[in-house]
Amino acid sequence: MTPLCHAPVWELVASGPQTVFPLLSQKTPTERRLVLDHLDYSIVRQYWDAAATSATAASYMAHEQGLPQSCVEHRFARERAVVQPWFDDLTSESSILDIGCGAGAWTMLFAQQHRRVVGIDMSPNMLAAARTRLGDMGNVELIEGDALQAPIEGTFDGAFVGGVLMYMNRDDAVLLLERLRLLVPTGPIVLRESTVRRGVEVKNAEYHVAYRSPTEYEAIAADAGLTVIAVERNRGYADMEVAVELVNLARRIPVLGRRDPELVGSPLWRALDMTAPVTLGLLPRAIEAVGVAWPHLTNHFMLLGTVELAQDLGH
């Protein structure tokens, strides 16, 4: 799919494979210049089709560093602790829309708790992995396609969007949230997106992605007629990102760089897990305390809904 043209929101301050856009409001009018996201969706699709050979790890971005299944499980457990309370008002008779369902980890969890679950993903290889995981669960429908255009019947009581908007140009992200506002008219919409602390960073070389700040997602939601009710940092992602950064650092050593990633990632994660209070807790905070944003990427959960839902929840 060819990316659409987009609303002029950001100023280009660097060029090359990674482009950084600060908040426009922080610049004077003479400094402002209009730019576009320029994400190529065909490249996004190619990346995920290739990554799906290790679908479970890939859906949690653990595949390139050879991180083990125990790392994926650690992250998923910490994520569930954030997300599940946001769906507490739903019942066993509720329906959930899972956009960007990947290998089906969240799809299975929702299907175990609710009457109807529809999962959507653009990667046939990811959906094949999801079908294997889900087996003969009869209350799940999986749809291959673009979440903007895929045929979706009925409305839902809640939606989960797992790392999808970061692969969409801004205008399309607004359009998707507008569609969700109609598909989930009264319930919670939960986003999980990799983020940066300020502004937007766009990578558009061999890997196309737009890392936005939570503040920018608030603006995108507002443009779609939705309210950001709550924002929570994804601690499970943060733990895994520490491992990712350390594996990347270790693999700069020639003898380690030539090895299978699993021979580096697996033992490193075990060491981090055994020393978690220091390596996953104190170390990142100590580095941030001296003014270094590390790990570079963050990840956030954002609870979205209508103004009426926000009022019902006391926000």
Language-model features, listed with the residues they occupy:
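Conserved helix-to-beta-strand junction in the class I
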Residues: 179-184
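Class I (Rossmann-like) S-adenosyl-L-methionine-dependent methyltransferase catalytic domain
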Residues: 3, 9-13, 20-94, 103-151, ...
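A conserved beta-strand element that flanks and buttresses the S-adenosyl-L-methionine
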Residues: 160
